[in-house]
Amino acid sequence: MKTKAKYQTWIRMYKLLIFLVISLMLFLVTLLSVNLYLRILSGFLALPFIYIAIILSYSVYQFTAFGGNYQSKIHDLIVSKVNWDGKGKILDIGTGSGSLIIKLAKTFPKSFLTGIDYWGGNWEYSKAQCQQNAEIEGVYNRINFIKASASKIPFNDEEFDVIVSCLTFHEVKDAENKMEVIKEALRVLKPGGEFVFLDLFMDEKMFGEKKELLNILKEYDVSEVNGYKLAEEMKIPRILLNKKVLGNAMILSGKK
């Protein structure tokens, strides 16, 4: 039986378990023979935890292959936005468990690809998992995985023909200004090279207003840039449009 690649979802399972356990504990207090006010208080306290646990649980289901498979569908959408002859080098920033970069490797069989990620910590991805998935999918010989922060990409200026990133920039902890992370990504893109970034770009507290964001990108030597709301590019279940999930998601694509 052929081994299948294992791709983790964007939802960290330990967070889901925390909310489930707290919800269950608070709910159980309401069933105990204790002070009535304590039971009522526990019930009220349980509500937000139950709400978040439901959203996270349903999001995991919709992102997985046995559910809605939306994580793979979103990666397919990003790949479809890459308008390129396939000859050259691709960089995937925040490669996770390798799903997006492996799709790119299959779509562009003459390309050479690099995936960077910080892995470790409380993330449930690993470099070893990426390498194993790439080997299973038959593209291992064309992909190099490197542990690195998106705020300090370990490559020279103008090294890549295409750069992609999916829901990574807002997670970079060692860069308070997320626009600097985008600037760093564009630093290693060749003149005339293409980029496709998907992130929570509609979160104005993090990235500013859309018009301002696009203007700043033009200051980073970008010759062409377009912004697309993810919800307008593909049909997404309503619960995934929660602001904490994909409600603020937007695709930025263009050329340097």
Spell out what each predicted region is.
Residues 234-256:
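Core SAM-dependent methyltransferase catalytic element
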Residues 86-96, 114:
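Conserved class I S-adenosyl-L-methionine
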Residues 178-191:
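A short glycine-rich, Lys/Arg-flanked "PGG" loop and its adjoining helix->strand segment in the class I
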Residues 151-163:
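A short acidic, Gly/Pro-enriched loop at the edge of an enzyme's catalytic core
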Residues 8-16, 53-77:
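Class I SAM-dependent methyltransferase Rossmann-like catalytic core
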Residues 138-150:
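Conserved SAM-binding strand-loop segment of SAM-dependent methyltransferases
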Residues 97-109:
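Conserved SAM-binding loop of SAM-dependent methyltransferases across substrates and taxa
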Residues 192-199:
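Conserved beta-strand signature within the Rossmann-like core of class I S-adenosyl-L-methionine
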